């Protein structure tokens, strides 16, 4: 590509998926520019690396670029898109550019409705500890690297494969992981689960004959598609028929301990033995994510010592059960602050279970911003069940992500339903422990009404709530 195109412009460069690709291309020697609506930590970092950053969208930003990269969040009437098309400059989707990057190395693509970022981070960390020095482009900041992307010298590139817009069908990886298949972004699949499953089968079939699909056998929908996959499959999970199987699982604060039985044969012919794992992450869902990384590493011949060391020393990922420490309360005492990206009921339930395991004797308080009206509508009942499983709750309205408002699928409706539900159940949540904030800026005041000494506060959501933990930690008290 480089002998034809040297200047590349990203519209919406501050997005997690876009910024990582931009950084790797810059390190490969391309001239990279980008624009975004607002300046943030990501754009500042990219600017410091040498990317030309424009704040705001303007046709002039296109300049002499030879290719323009957009995500599905960028509208077709964006002024820079219109200018590029008028000038006959190619406008390509983010997934297409990611696919071009993957042509340079052997791709390891992590797919699934939930857990992609953590699993990709674990895979990258284990391969790095094993001396394979991978390139990675992931959706969150890998704390050990201080970034969500890195150009390695090794033969492999670890990426996230996005099913939300079916763009994972643009990729041709050599190895794949599927963590789970759940009903989300169903507009893409005409609200048909069969179509969604078929898309994952198509994704797996894009691998070459020497590839391997590492699939979570614990997930019913993943199990359903295995008979339709012709490529080699490595099954992982806690199920008895898993090839990479965890057992003797126990929680120890924010760490998990378990043994791993590997019933596979390494590519170089030596049968791997059992492993004793200490994972520096909480929750059963992260045990499964670690098993996926163990499966990939085992297939690539990474040594057992490197696998166990990488998992025990894993530094975490930004906004995935990210711990901010203790925050003092004005009323006396303090609370523990944790931030998480979860925005689907399944993800929220997994985080809740991890928190209950890590902090079994403490109240769990949730500050939640729903994400997208369609998801709130489609998963309304599941959201209510999760919300009322916390001990206290502060809700705000839905982050629309460009969607039009849907009556009855908003924050106030969720709050009312969560309170009403308790009358017919043994839910822990009660109306005295619930508050509604009209905006994110009102949340600190509402939290003062519900937080008590010793509480664990989890801020959760995929929208503008990402700024709340920073606000709370910088204030040094609530």
Swiss-Prot record:
The gene is murC. Signal peptide: none annotated. It comes from the Bacteria. This is UDP-N-acetylmuramate--L-alanine ligase. It is an enzyme of class 6 (ligase). The lineage of its organism: Bacteria, Pseudomonadati, Pseudomonadota, Betaproteobacteria, Burkholderiales. One of its GO terms (molecular function) is ATP binding. ATP binds at residues 112-118. HAMAP family: MurC. GO terms for biological process: cell division; cell wall organization; peptidoglycan biosynthetic process; regulation of cell shape. NCBIfam families: murC. GO terms for cellular component: cytoplasm. Cell wall formation. Belongs to the MurCDEF family. Keywords: ATP-binding, Cell cycle, Cell division, Cell shape, Cell wall biogenesis/degradation, Cytoplasm, Ligase, Nucleotide-binding, Peptidoglycan synthesis. It holds the Pfam family Mur_ligase. It is found in: Cytoplasm.
